[in-house]
Design a protein with these regions (language model features):
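Subtilisin-like serine protease catalytic core
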Residues: 171-212, 216-268, 282-285, 311-312, ...
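Beta-sheet-dominated interaction scaffolds and their linkers
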Residues: 319, 532-537, 629-665, 706-708, ...
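Autoinhibitory propeptides
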Residues: 22, 49-164, 169-175, 199-204, ...
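Catalytic-core environment of secreted peptidases
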Residues: 203, 215, 220-221, 448-451, ...
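Substrate-binding/access-modulating region of protease and related hydrolase catalytic domains
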Residues: 180, 240, 257-343, 348-355, ...
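C-terminal subdomain of the subtilisin-like protease fold in secreted/lumenal serine endopeptidases
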Residues: 64-65, 161, 247, 288, ...
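Contiguous beta-strand segments within globular domains
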Residues: 649-657, 784-857, 862, 894-904
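Surface-exposed binding patches on compact interaction domains or structured appendages
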Residues: 612-613, 640-641, 664-722, 727, ...
Length: 1010
């Protein structure tokens, strides 16, 4: 066993007050237990009824009753129960309780400050584009179909946002698939159903058709969103506002709103379970939730189990992976960790210099020519109206092929008003009566660099504006962002500015120079096919090495709806998940199925693995890769399973069968190969804590039983896949390797099946930090407050006060779980035990006091109820003798990180440890460990310390501490503080008598310092 010292045992002052600096800098954990609250799963509802009745008879309350075909249980609030044993004691009284868990508080971790928040601005929400030079060929449609959005798109009334273009959602919209008739539940902070993009009403016939409020605020029948998170999710999922050009992934789907968090985005695990189960009960066909318990990373927590069971019942469930990328590997959010749950990580787009598409025509008969450009200002002004192009440079005598590289540069400091009058006085359109308005309704084409002669680029822009132009299209050899003043020298606004490449500008100018008219317009946004992992994201896999995330989708700076009717853009995995849920709705229309396993397999196998720094990004960050909605909806080759998990070295399967099915009408030949992703060390060099992963070049050896197969129409073949750990890596650092089995079909299909494995042994890895430094202790002797009720252990006023003893509300300590643990115990271990048959000496200790007790005084000289613990209350587990565990322990499936503990002396309901010497011993079961095997436990111990209670100590009356009722509390006002000090000075005037030769104030300060 590992038995290093613990971190510091710290004194909690008698008031329990938090220093101001600590309060200002403290960050509340995203999840913690709700005191005395538990979730119980019952074999039958009758068992739950009996337990609920017993709880209420004891003065407890029923929090929730869960009656579902996937989960039968209750959550209860138990009064006056201080330990996990109390809950277990209650549970043991009833047969038919399958499992129980403490309720955790949920504190939603915000994604980001809004990238852009506006009533009107649509940051890229008004775009539709086909990939340049390519048109999707739609196979025969099956299942449901709705064509309203398809008609709208073809009539150019609304365009698709960039996240739809990247994932090919727009192609499904073009085919008329919009989620019509599909019910999608949003389990979140509620929905602002008054938002114009979300229907403006609540109830039958509305976009938001039903819902319920499970939070601790508001009307239980009204799921209105007072926080805003759920409204963003709902807009990405199914919003539609033609006037603002906003469209969600499944704009004709209906929403079911289940509010489980309050206005501060806080809630509890049982509230969330209630929302999930109600969504299923109400007939949701897809469930999306973008909130949960950060970093839990276990599939066995109750919320993850409920989500997994809903999936197993046939309802796809989609959850964001989390936003704690800085925490490194193995930090997925519960319930995304549930088996079969679709876990989504967030991508951003790979930015390009020119992201918008236009077209121009020459003469009256030629086909339009596509070109790309970037609007630097006035995106909404670059509409689809076809406008004539005018070459302003030609007006100044510059031809499209002139060599202007030697042109004189104009100084940066320019008086724009004088340049118009002097340098460009003879410019076209300039006459004694002012500038002619010959460019009204035109696009002014102007070369930006190299500098043009006679009149600078910016002068020519102002010349064009003065002549009535509202659209400026600059061109140059290396087009970059062009900045133009918002107004010209005469105060006229510059409404729309864009820039394009020299090949485009020169072609237009040449045509105009030859006397042919040119017309141009913007027609949408360029489809950007590649992305990068967003900063607001997380790492998998789970502690069982289940592949999470399932998929990646755009979640960084995506168009969103805000509560109150606004629009803008925002970031986080919360905003990648609803896009995937909407895609599931579209896929269900195309394929006429909601089978979660099939939908997951399709999105994973058709996804596009992404690259960073010339390496494929680990599967632990991108799952199958970047979502491709159209390809997933129309794929004719199916794979099962959708992902291959090879576990760690000690638990490696010999091989995994990969079944490939050809559902096409003709036979297809497939070529199989390995695509290896970046291998990451779980631990940095010299560390035992998971990090963001040091990348190494070594990859696993993947063996395929067949590399070329031909499968007939409607037939299947199984290929065996085996894996060997990368060579030359340190197994103690747990190298996490991954990649994809590539399946290229002769029909043009290109599928990839993700795989993942771990070198080394998770079971053997350190769970507890064996090198925790012990901070200096303020004391090894503690005088605890008397128990509020029940027993008063030890004799009263039998021990004289010790100047070394610390008076404390509780003993506080902490330990560090560097990995998660399936089971953690925290035992109270007495160092002095005696037989219950031994004689009891009830005499006082006298001057010996607590110090003597701490040194292990002879038990014959001490009161046995104080000096030693009767062995009748001692139990043994895995070689450790204990009187019980700290409140809340043992705990199952604990997340990694710092674990804070407090002990007030209690070890059972209304039972407190006798005065004496103790250690607190924490033990954590290794991942994949056997609880019955002592070798699978790791241990840390506190230093030895001694405890007494206030009533044990004989304190002179003048020095007695105030009672609990009269003890000092933090001042609420300055007046209270002033009154306290006035009273204190009146009672202790001797402390402030000035010393000889010193000023009064100095003496008072010196006395206070002493």
């Amino acid at each position: 066993m590992i038995s290093p010292p613990w971190l510091a045992i710290l004194w909690l002052g008698a008031t329990g007050a938090t220093p101001a600096w600590a309060a200002e800098n403290a960050t509340e954990p995203p999840s913690k237990n709700v005191s005395g609250a538990f979730i119980l799963e019952c074999e039958t509802s009758q068992v739950c009824d009996s337990v609920a009745k017993a709880v209420e008879e004891r003065g407890g309350t029923l929090r929730h009753r869960f009656k579902s075909d996937v989960f039968t249980g209750i959550s209860v609030q138990l009064p006056k129960l201080t330990t996990e044993e109390d809950r277990r004691s209650l549970v043991s009284q009833f047969k038919g309780i399958k499992e129980s868990w403490p309720v955790q508080q949920v504190i939603h971790v915000p994604e980001s400050t809004a990238d852009d928040r506006s009533e009107d601005k649509q940051d890229g929400t008004n775009e539709k584009e086909e990939e340049l030079g390519k048109k999707p060929v739609a196979p025969p449609k099956t299942g449901m179909r709705h064509s309203r959005l398809g008609r709208r798109a073809r009539n150019d009334d609304i365009e698709s946002p960039w996240n739809h273009l990247m994932t090919h959602v727009d192609k499904l919209h073009e085919e008329g698939y919009t989620g019509s008739g599909i019910k999608i539940a949003v389990v979140d902070t509620g929905v602002d159903y008054k938002h114009p993009a979300l229907g403006g009403c609540f109830g039958p016939g509305c976009k938001v058709i039903t819902g319920e409020n499970f939070s601790d605020e508001g009307d239980k029948s009204d799921p209105i969103d007072c926080h805003g998170h759920g409204t963003i999710v709902s807009g990405i999922l199914a919003g539609y506002d033609e006037a603002k050009g906003f469209v969600g992934a499944a704009p004709d789907a209906t929403i079911m709103a289940y509010r489980v968090l309050n206005c501060q985005a806080r809630g509890t695990e049982d509230d969330m379970i209630a929302g999930w189960l109600k969504a299923k009960q109400d007939g949701a066909q897809i469930i999306i939730s973008s909130t949960g318990l950060q970093g839990e990373n276990w599939a066995q927590r109750p919320l993850a189990m409920v989500a997994a069971r809903i999936v197993a019942s046939g309802v796809p469930c989609v959850v964001g992976l989390g936003n704690e990328q800085h925490e490194g590997l193995f930090y997925a959010m519960n319930p995304s960790t549930g088996h079969g749950v679709t876990a989504v990580n967030s991508f951003g787009r790979a930015y390009a210099a020119l992201e918008h598409r236009g077209e121009y025509s020459i003469g009256n008969t030629t086909e339009p020519v596509d070109f790309i450009f970037e609007p630097a200002r006035g995106l909404d002004k670059w509409d689809r109206e076809l406008r004539p192009v005018h070459d302003v440079d030609a007006d100044f005598g510059d031809g499209p092929d002139d060599d202007l590289t030697a042109a004189k540069e104009v100084p940066i400091s320019i008086d724009w008003s004088t340049r118009i009058e002097e340098n460009c006085k003879l410019s076209p359109g300039n006459s004694s009566t002012g500038f002619a308005q010959d460019l009204v309704g035109h696009i002014a084409l102007i070369r930006q660099t190299p500098e043009t002669r006679d009149c600078h680029f910016y002068d020519r822009v102002q010349n064009a504006i003065a002549r009535g132009a509202e659209h400026i299209l600059a061109w140059q050899n290396d087009p970059v962002y062009v900045e133009i003043r918002r107004k010209d020298a005469m105060g006229r606004p510059v409404k729309a500015v864009g820039i394009t490449g020299a090949d485009v500008g020169r072609a237009m100018a040449r045509a105009l120079a030859s006397g042919q008219p040119v017309k141009a317009r913007r027609i949408g946004r360029v489809r950007i096919e590649t992305g990068h992992i967003a900063g607001m994201s997380a790492y998998g896999p789970t502690w069982e090495l289940d592949i999470k995330p399932t998929i990646g989708a755009p979640g960084h700076s995506v168009p969103v709806t805000y509560k109150g009717g606004g629009y803008g853009s925002d970031s986080g995995t919360s905003f990648a998940g609803p896009l995937v849920a909407g895609v599931f709705a579209l896929m269900s229309q195309v394929r006429a199925t909601f089978d979660p396993a099939l939908l997951n397999s399709l999105i994973m196998s058709t996804a596009e693995p992404q690259i960073s720094d010339d390496r494929l990004i680990t599967v632990a960050q991108q799952g199958g890769g970047l979502l491709r909605a159209w390809e997933a909806a129309h794929a004719t080759t199916l794979v099962e399973p959708g992902a291959l998990t090879f576990n760690d070295t000690n638990n490696r399967p010999g091989s995994i069968g990969l079944r490939i099915t050809n559902t096409a009408k003709t036979e297809v030949t497939y070529q199989l190969s390995n695509l290896a992703a970046t291998t990451l060390y779980t631990f940095e060099s010299g560390s035992i804590r998971p990090g963001v992963g040091e990348a190494v070049d070594a990859t696993a050896d993947i063996n395929l039983s067949q590399t070329s197969i031909t499968i007939g129409a409607g037939q299947s073949t199984t290929v065996d896949v085996s894996a060997i750990d990368p060579k030359g890596l340190d197994p103690e650092r747990l190298p996490l390797w991954s990649g994809w089995v590539s399946i290229q079909g002769s029909d043009g299909g290109n599928l990839t099946v993700p795989y993942l494995g771990l070198g080394g042994s998770l079971r053997s890895a350190a769970v507890l930090d064996p090198a925790s430094e012990l901070s200096s202790l303020s004391s090894s002797e503690f005088i605890l407050r008397d128990p509020p009720e029940g027993q008063k252990p030890g004799p009263s006023k039998a021990i004289e006060d010790s100047p070394a003893a610390i008076r404390s509300r509780a003993i506080s300590t902490s330990f560090d779980l560097v990995l998660g643990s399936p089971l953690v115990r925290v035992d109270i271990v007495p160092l002095d035990m005696c037989s219950t048959s031994a004689p009891v000496n009830t005499t006082s200790v006298g001057t010996r006091g607590l110090a003597g007790l701490a040194r292990g005084a002879n038990v014959t000289e001490l009161d046995l109820s104080r000096a030693c613990v009767p062995d009748s209350i001692v139990t043994e587990f895995a070689g450790v003798r204990s009187i019980g565990q700290l409140p809340g322990y043992p705990k199952n499936y604990v997340k990694r990180g710092k674990v804070n503990l407090e002990w007030t002396g209690a070890f059972a309901p209304e039972h407190y440890a006798p005065p004496g010497r103790y250690q607190i011993v924490a033990r954590a079961l290794s991942i994949m460990g056997d609880a019955s095997n002592e070798a699978h436990w790791q241990t840390v111990k506190s230093p030895v310390f001694s405890i007494l209670y206030e009533h044990n100590v004989n304190v002179p009356e003048a020095d007695q501490q105030p009672s609990e009722e009269n003890s000092w509390k933090p001042w609420q006002t300055k007046e209270e503080e002033a009154a306290f000090w006035a009273n204190y000075l009146a009672q202790h005037p001797e402390l402030f008598q000035p010393k000889a030769g010193a000023e009064d104030t100095d003496a008072a300060e010196n006395s206070l310092e002493k």
